[in-house]
Amino acid sequence: MIDFDGYRPNVGIVICNRKGQVLWAKRCGQNSWQFPQGGINDNESAEQAMYRELHEEVGLQPKDVRLLYVSKHWLRYKLPKRLLRYDSKPMCIGQKQRWFLLQLVSDEKNINMQTTKSPEFDGWRWVSFWYPVRQVVSFKRDVYRKVMKEFASILFTDNPLIFSTSREANSQHYSANKKYSQTKYTKRHFYKSRGQ
């Protein structure tokens, strides 16, 4: 489904833990990282799409998370010309996204990136709250900056839940079902990576 302006309606998902860190996911077979996201199907609300994508991409059920906040506005980004599919009709020039802030309330062992035959991600880790803004691919950076600024006002001021504002990233790195070897994937490796 693409709107009249050429944007595909989409949901973005930020999952935080009780330390205020956020789940950062590694795209399959790539050294690029991003938040979970996905398109909204016909006759599907943004919230329904979010829970579907949450299960498909992260393996979590509604009972595993608490919905803390939904972005007030749709946020848009344009795809770079090299990613446009000029032969598709109608042509999609970018995404318009409604963002959801969730808190993980179940055990993180329930996170499983391998729930579908064609998974989007093959690994994940917890990172400090602002880390994704600096690391995501450049054409998504403005959207990430806006959504994280909006979510920060909820997590760190208005929300009664207590979060640490530490900018220190968790040093544990996870695959879909097992921990990444720290000898193979060093902290330097992760900090140099870029999301897509």
Swiss-Prot record:
Record-linked InterPro entries: Nudix_hydrolase (IPR020476), NUDIX_hydrolase-like_dom_sf (IPR015797), NUDIX_hydrolase_CS (IPR020084), NUDIX_hydrolase_dom (IPR000086), RppH (IPR022927)
GO biological process: mRNA catabolic process
Domain Nudix hydrolase span(s) in chain numbering: 6-149
Keywords for the protein's UniProt record, in alphabetical order: Hydrolase
Short motif (Nudix box): ranges: 38-59
Required cofactor names: a divalent metal cation
One Pfam family per UniProt: NUDIX
Its job: Accelerates the degradation of transcripts by removing pyrophosphate from the 5'-end of triphosphorylated RNA, leading to a more labile monophosphorylated state that can stimulate subsequent ribonuclease cleavage.
Listed name of the protein: RNA pyrophosphohydrolase
This protein's encoding gene: rppH
